[in-house]
């Protein structure tokens, strides 16, 4: 993330400085005197590149493509190169600070970067990708990549995981202003990446999976949202702390992260739906991957959360209220429902299964991992809904090793 942002900033600065003297004012007559502008659009059909307002140098505008439009950013700081290639790319940048290179591909729209800090490169490739720009404050990473109609609006003020990477109509969740955002969508059909609000950096969004939904509560950081295929929505990560990388590979492994405070052993890799909720006060491992309609639970503000679910079919996971970190959302299982009672920790919500909803964890304490796989198992705490299983998370203050992988149809309960 940092390397990408740094590289984008360096490219924008270097291109702006190199093009300051090379670009003649004949190509940009509307350019205000005293402020250099990047090179206007080159090649393509009907390229439009309105000049940037006075203030700082601008990178080169869109090149090639059919009817690319790249309005220059308002005065303030240099802007990276606008969209290149593609059909009808539009990327008007807001005034203020430098922006990374806009979208490249077909009908891609680069999200506007609000003034304040540099923005990462916008979506590349794909059909009709849309990436609304982030609010002013800090740089934004690249928007969603691939995926089918993923949606993930993030809450303003704090960092969010990387937006969904899917195939069609993927929308990256907004990262609140103030901090950098992950890389925008690349490829795919009709990806949309609404920009994050100012505040903190956003991690990479969900990849793969069908119709994952996981809106996080504002106030604290959330791990990377679900990565699924169709209509995946990355859960919003509330502002607060950094987010870990989302799970990759394995067969729907669950490794609920430990509460912030102390280190945790390596989370489960491979295997069948292993479950292991971590105690509060310590760092959290990567969240669930796969599952049907699993929604990643929101991580309350204040502590970091592991990465959310990736893949799976239509994962749904309502996020927990703010207060303490929550384990990974549900994986596996058939329609598990188990909202935990407020005030106590709840394990990671169910992962996988059909139309499973992870119970929200009330603010105050972390939540242990809920059901994983099996048919409607019942755990100890939750009063509400269905036959959910919710094992209690271990007390805070002690490190937790890797969770035990379950053997057989029923999920293993985490250590207390």
Curated annotation (Swiss-Prot):
Query: What else is noted?
Result: Peptides IB-9 and P-E are the same peptide.
Task: Tell where it localizes.
Answer: Secreted
Signal is among the record's keywords: yes
Please state what the protein is called. Basic salivary proline-rich protein 2
Q: Which residues form a coiled coil?
A: none
> Phosphoserine is carried by which residues?
24, 52
Where is carbohydrate linked to this protein? Answer: 168, 230, 232, 272
Q: Residues where Pyrrolidone carboxylic acid occurs? A: 17
The UniProt annotation puts the region (15 X 20 AA approximate tandem repeats of P-P-G-K-P-Q-G-P-P-P-Q-G-[GD]-[NKS]-[KSQ]-[PRS]-[QRS] [GPS]-[PSAR]-[PSR]) at 53-360
Where do Polar residues bias regions lie?
19-28
Quote the gene name from the UniProt entry: PRB2
Pfam families assigned: Pro-rich
Where does the source fall among the domains of life?
Eukaryota
The entry's keywords:
Glycoprotein, Phosphoprotein, Pyrrolidone carboxylic acid, Repeat, Secreted, Signal
PTM summary from the entry reads: N- and O-glycosylated. In head and neck cancer patients, O-glycosylated with glucosylgalactosyl carbohydrate moiety. This modification would require prior hydroxylation on the lysine residue.
């Amino acid at each position: 993330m940092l390397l990408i942002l740094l590289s984008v900033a360096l490219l924008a600065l270097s291109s702006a400085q190199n093009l300051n003297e090379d670009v003649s004012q004949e190509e940009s007559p509307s350019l205000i005197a005293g402020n250099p502008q990047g090179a206007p659009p080159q090649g393509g059909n009907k390229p439009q590149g309105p000049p940037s307002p006075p203030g700082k140098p601008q990178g080169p505008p869109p090149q090639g493509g059919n009817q690319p439009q790249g309005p220059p950013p308002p005065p303030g700081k240099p802007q990276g190169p606008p969209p290149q290639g593609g059909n009808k790319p539009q990327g008007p940048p807001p005034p203020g600070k430098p922006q990374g290179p806009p979208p490249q591909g077909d009908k891609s729209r680069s999200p506007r970067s609000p003034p304040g800090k540099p923005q990462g490169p916008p979506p590349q490739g794909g059909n009709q990708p849309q990436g609304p720009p982030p609010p002013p404050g800090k740089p934004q990473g690249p928007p969603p990549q691939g995926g089918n109609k993923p949606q993930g609006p993030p809450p303003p003020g704090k960092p969010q995981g990387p937006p969904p990477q899917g195939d069609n109509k993927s929308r990256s969740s907004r990262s609140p202003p103030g901090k950098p955002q992950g890389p925008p969508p690349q490829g795919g059909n009709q990806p949309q990446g609404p920009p994050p609000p100012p505040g903190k950096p956003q991690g990479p969004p969900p990849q793969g999976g069908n119709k994952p939904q996981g809106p996080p509560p504002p106030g604290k950081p959330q791990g990377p949202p679900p990565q699924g295929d169709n209509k995946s929505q990355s859960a919003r990560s509330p502002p607060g702390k950094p987010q870990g990388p989302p799970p990759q590979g394995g067969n729907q492994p669950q490794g609920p992260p430990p509460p912030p405070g102390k280190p945790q052993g390596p989370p489960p890799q491979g295997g069948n739906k292993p479950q292991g909720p971590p105690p509060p006060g310590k760092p959290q491992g990567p969240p669930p991957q796969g599952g049907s309609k699993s929604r990643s639970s929101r991580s309350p503000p204040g502590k970091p959360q592991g990465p959310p679910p990736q893949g799976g079919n239509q994962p749904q996971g309502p996020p927990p209220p703010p207060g303490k970190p929550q384990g990974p959302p549900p994986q596996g299982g058939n329609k598990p429902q188990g909202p935990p009672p407020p005030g106590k920790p709840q394990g990671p919500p169910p992962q996988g299964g059909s139309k499973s909803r992870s119970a929200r964890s009330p603010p105050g304490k972390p939540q242990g991992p809920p059901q994983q796989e099996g048919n409607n198992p019942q755990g100890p705490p939750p009063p509400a809904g269905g036959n959910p299983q919710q094992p209690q998370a271990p007390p805070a203050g002690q490190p937790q090793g890797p969770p035990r992988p379950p053997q057989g149809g029923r999920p293993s309960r985490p250590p207390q």
